[in-house]
From Swiss-Prot:
Note in the entry: A stretch of 270 kb of the mitochondrial genome is duplicated within the centromere of chromosome 2 resulting in the duplication of the gene. The expression of the duplicated gene (At2g07686) is not demonstrated.
GO annotations of cellular component type: mitochondrion
Annotated compartments: Mitochondrion
Protein name: Uncharacterized mitochondrial protein AtMg00740
Primary subcellular site in the record, as a coarse category: mitochondrion
Keywords: Mitochondrion
Domain of life (superkingdom): Eukaryota
Length: 100
């Protein structure tokens, strides 16, 4: 009989699933984490992290990249990677403007 640890039976929120899936996809696409964390250095990490990840997960789900990723050629992956990096830069610049 297969033993399932109690911790795996605990309910997990949709936000946690979204973050988990997003982080795995970003890792696979190859976004450098230092770029992401740099944007959160002087800010409330929790709230911004969720907001930015929501933008990304919506983009990823909208494009169905999670399901099609393995079929994409390297050039397509680069376009997606650049698009996500640009999204980070736009959000980062908006945050900087709000600080002034």
């Amino acid at each position: 009989m297969l033993h399932i640890s109690q911790e795996f039976l605990l309910p997990i929120s949709m936000e946690h699933w979204r973050l988990l899936i997003t982080s795995q996809v970003i890792k696979k696409i190859g976004i450098p984490w230092k770029v992401i964390f740099h944007a959160f250095q002087n800010h409330n990490r929790g709230i911004l992290f969720l907001q930015i990840f929501e933008h990304i997960i919506d983009f990823l789900f909208g494009e169905a990249i999670i399901y099609r990723y393995v079929l994409l050629d390297p050039k397509s992956r680069q376009v997606i990677r650049d698009s996500i990096l640009n999204s980070f830069l736009v959000l980062y610049n908006q945050i900087k403007l709000l600080e002034k």
